[in-house]
């Protein structure tokens, strides 16, 4: 398992929950095979076929967030990274990406 972790800053804390809900709806649309408006169908198919899990964490006090996108293979991760790196948060107040890193998941334990 491989993960792409992106950090964002500058999101308006007052709109953070709305942004997360919008992302959740977009992910559900992609899962259903109906990419959201503005996303080419090919991009939706890459995400649908390559992403196995998305985890988002936020700090409501300052509007920072992190997004972990999990892929089964390193090849899938590279395809997803290329696609996501070309995207930016769509709205004013949605902040900007400040860092992206790739990792291999070597332990995932629930306790």
PLM region descriptions:
Residues 1-66, 72-83, 93-111:
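Short S/T/G/P-rich N-terminal loop/turn motif that feeds into the first structured element of a domain
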Residues 89-90:
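Helix-adjacent hinge/juxtasegments
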